[in-house]
Amino acid sequence: SDILKALWGRVGRPPREELLAWFTDLRSPAKDIGEWAFYLLLAMVALTLLTRLLAYRPWRVLHRAMPLIYLALALHSVVLLPASLWAAPLGWLMGGLIALGSLAALWSLAGWVGLRRTHNGHIHSVRVLGSGGVHEPIEVICALPSSWPGHRSGQFAFVRFDRSEGMHPFTIASAPDSLGHGPHGEALLRLVIKPLGDYTRTLGQRLRVGQSVAIEGPYGRFDGQGSGRRQQVWVAAGVGLTPFLALLEARQPSVAAGAADAHPAHLHYCTRHAASDPLLPRLRSLCATAQPAVQLQVYDDAQGQRLTPQALAAQHPGPIDLWFCGPQGLGDALDAHAARGWRLHRESFAMR
């Protein structure tokens, strides 16, 4: 082609000497690029680990830059590896890994990650629960097109309300088909969002009915099923209740087919203040009519009631399937003190 001829002469094929000279000329810039990329990588890893120092939006920008750093390090490796190494099996392995990594980096930079599983819909309804204060959970019901494959109770999705913010993970807080369909036959699903971070604190003021929403998913296997030979124990704290709301909806008589393989369960729910908890009345109602039965036990922090791994082990001796969704500290405590025979299933949204 004309491009090859411009680079390598009229024949369009680089003589071996010219190719080696070209690689030799690249060695100095490749060395500098690799060195600076390595320093940037160390700094970005440190910032990623120290998440409290960085809000989500700047962290996301740094995260999106990771593929560029990988490509710089790949160039560094390709140019500086000894020529003799490329003829050895180790060189073939390195070349294959670098090629696959570079392809993945370019795929990410092009914005194609999760694209096939992304569905564009709109907000069907939005309301602030409880007293309507800025710290209360937000219920968002989304209407999705026919391309949405449906979900299973307990799954989550990545949701984008604002293109500048990117995707955020939220649990789907409704059972399949429990909300019916929109006016044009759209599938409806519910999100319950607690204003905890710099992004979610402003959603209640920014979301509007009819606003576009992109949902990628669904993902996850947090189905609360477990083995019939084990006690099924659910532990929820705060907004970690949302997957269990979906699981409980699936156990209602009107949608009993969604819980055909379910077993009786015992739900331990931890709340800061039971009297003002906007999710608790619905939780009690769902537990009262669930089939198979779900026994509810509430721990009110305002009354000094705390759930501990030791108390849980005493109440549920023997093998159990423990399903947990809530603050990382409580999850770590349950994991660290897990009694023999516990099988811990843990929902975690520590994405950074």
Name each model-derived stretch.
Residues 1-109, 180, 186, 195-352:
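FNR/FR-type flavoprotein reductase catalytic core
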Residues 113-214, 232, 264-266, 270-273, ...:
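Ferredoxin-reductase
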